[in-house]
């Protein structure tokens, strides 16, 4: 364990002094009245609460709360703010029974009063040596019974007592000494903690997805995202030995459908990034850049769809899979690709959203993985078609890389048309609200020596504008889930790298690279409210209600820098801050 730094001592002193002014009885009463979170609550959350990453297991990012609506959102004002831990900030606050749980960089967790930010308790995990670069991006935790469950930078699952912050159990799942870590947090489905491992860059393994007993932490099953020799899909890695089959991080949270008993998880890129570096040229390298549907009881892969076979360009596909029941009536002129064999007007359960960096909405049958339709939301040249029979995308041969340092114009950049910031869905409109960005890069692969213990950094990318760019980088597109039509598109100079919150008040909240946090009319795309923050917001916005008052919360700090394309829009590092708004 490392010795506390002077900064940590200073912060602890300040917090202790501030806490002295908080009525102890009020804080204790709030914690004493905290009720256990049941499996039924997780499946159908109370409307006042936000219990998991995107609020519900289907990843809608939607709350039915409607006190704040189109008629009064213009009156939103700041209720309170809270300075957060410095470091990489991509967090999702959770709220239950008036208590907010705030995961922060490098596994620092605080519980605060959700009405004013008064601190209740804190947990700080010791920082281990040689921590992986991206390990401190603590995106989410989850609530279950009396527990707050976190997945840590040192590859542990940890259960904290939600009333006290004390550790009730912990389980080691990966090996932090070789870079394995969690960045996407846990989800609890049907009593199981579902997580995906990240950081499988260095040693003789790809990554995996696990289920653990939510009461004890006992591991129930483990499914490899990169198959070994002799396993189904293993042949797609050619003759590459197991110890060099690397990558396949599952670095964002899973979604779940109880009726199908399926877990939906996205998988990232192979390592190194280029097929000529891996010596896998011509192979699909399953299950990288894929959507996986797993049996929740066994971890068996029921179906998969590979969005990019044999990846070369760091175009990850680990993002949210949104589960929606809808009519499927895609309009051929409105979408990029369509399955000609689908039964039009048939109502079915689908997986939709933007699962990967190219910024394409993919819609698949949730039960079978059958491809239905796909639609581009930003300029991209990576995917040019769909192999329906082969269950995979078709990549652009013009950007295929056959030599080290061979330069190609690839769109989007390695930061993506989209990234970890999430699409939102509203059941009121049956539409997705998709943030994305028009970017390209000059991209080339560097020499690597693919040996056990070698780092994965394997390419150079230089951000450039897309061909014939008009200078507008950021987009927010409302996409009809049934037809694929764009209901409306908002475009602007600044990048839009914020997650979307949709509400029962007919609103769409999203932040951008220029520090603006806005509320849009979900039907028309009109901007109804705007607040300038101290920084762009890398966190996920939420809404909740306490004592009949609805609040909107957003964690600022972090985000993606598009300065090469928009040099006049300045960003300053640090400054992590939670903002909470309400009506007067």
Residue ranges and their predicted role:
Residues 47-48, 97-98, 145-146, 190-191, ...:
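Short coil/turn segments that connect the beta-strands within blades of beta-propeller domains
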Residues 10-21:
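Bacterial N-terminal signal peptides
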Residues 59-173, 503:
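N-terminal cofactor/phosphate-binding cores enriched in small/glycine residues
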Residues 81-94, 122-144, 170-185, 203, ...:
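Extracytoplasmic beta-rich repeat domains
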Residues 29-78, 225-230, 396-399, 465-466, ...:
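Blade/loop signatures of beta-propeller domains
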Residues 114-116, 161-164, 214-216, 296-298, ...:
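Short loop/turn segments that connect beta-strands within beta-propeller blades
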Residues 542-584:
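Blade-level signature of beta-propeller repeat domains, shared across WD40, Kelch, NHL, RCC1
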